[in-house]
Amino acid sequence: MPKHNALRVMSVSVATAGALSLGLTGPAAHASTPLDYVALGDSYSAGSGVLPVDLSNLLCLRSTANYPHVIAAGTGASLDDVTCGGAQTKDFTEAQYPGVPPQTDALDAGTDLVTLTIGGNDNGTFINAVTACGSAGLLSGGKGSPCKDKNGSTFTDQIETNTYPALKAALRDVRAKAPGARVAALGYPWITPATADPSCFAKLPIAAGDIPYLRDIQAHLNAAVKRSAEETGAVYVDFSQVSEGHDACADRGTRWIEPLLFSANLVPVHPNALGERRMAGHTMEVLGLD
């Protein structure tokens, strides 16, 4: 099956630079036969908001410094990056935009490696939660847990009822179209700390009691990704430990996720360039590509 927007990332200079940036040395960093690597997923995979922008399809807000490109540079893989900002699981099998084919069209029997981050946009669950809690936080002056009080288990119920089965179906489709591939489903790095930090309110205007509430929603989403991966033979890449302390409330240079306000990214509440590099590095470590 023809590849879409296939990007050959096999230049020695580019691959060497990527390997050095991740601390990769020796033959493990470069396979003798380049991996046929397809990257799927949403804005966390696409690196939306991270410069430089991939000009091949501006609708997808894809960065050429996203974690798929870092992985490809570090391994010498042949990358077909079909990630797209705003993607939902349904966009694996449906066209997301005119001229943007279903993402799994990029897969075939020759695909060796697939990575993906997906599920956060399904039913608008996570963006709706962040928006609702941000609005409630501003209105409450950061006090109490107005978002939790109003929404209760609405968001986690949506994840369990809708997102989890959709994730499982999407991963099954990936497996059917790329039966010989290693499939890595990445969790989402922490957006909020475990407990409220009063100094963070100016950057992330979430009420103190809603910080753990939002984190619990994200934990449910990651659990759904993990369960789906385990049930379909994919590898789950867990960021719950390695991203601790690198949330949107951390200082610039430490955080992997940019805050809602005063973001250094073009797209807030998304990984910055450091976050994309760290997502790549941890994924390579889990997959034994380091």
What are these regions, as identified by a protein language model?
Residues 1-31:
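Secretory targeting and sorting signals
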Residues 26-38, 96-115, 168-182, 284, ...:
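Short amphipathic alpha-helices and their capping/turn segments at secondary-structure boundaries
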Residues 32-86, 104-105, 133-139:
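Serine-esterase "nucleophile elbow" of acetyl-processing enzymes
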Residues 36-41, 45-46, 78-83, 112-117, ...:
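Structural recognition of the beta-strand scaffold that forms the well-ordered cores
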Residues 48, 98-158, 190:
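Oxyanion-hole/transition-state-stabilizing segment in secreted/luminal serine hydrolases
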Residues 87-104, 249-263:
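Charged, often glycine-rich, active-site loop that binds/positions anionic groups
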Residues 113-116, 139-175, 184, 189-236:
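Conserved N-terminal glycine/acidic-rich loop preference
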Residues 189-290:
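Catalytic His-Asp segment of secreted/periplasmic serine-dependent ester chemistry enzymes
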